From Swiss-Prot:
One Gene Ontology cellular component: nucleosome
The protein's name in its UniProt record: Protamine
Function: Protamines substitute for histones in the chromatin of sperm during the haploid phase of spermatogenesis. They compact sperm DNA into a highly condensed, stable and inactive complex.
Region spans: Disordered: 1-34
Protein's GO biological process: cell differentiation; chromosome condensation; spermatogenesis
Gene source species: Perca flavescens (American yellow perch)
Superkingdom of the organism of origin: Eukaryota
Length: 34
């Protein structure tokens, strides 16, 4: 039997996450530096 992932708790889909925003910030910094 296949296991279902995160079936127990419903999660709202969010486009932005802390991780993506952090990466964005890093890219901006690098751009400014160059």
């Amino acid at each position: 039997p296949r296991r279902r992932r995160h079936a127990a708790r419903p999660v709202r889909r969010r486009r932005r996450t802390r991780r993506s925003s952090r990466v964005h910030r890093r890219r901006r910094a690098v751009r400014r530096r160059r």
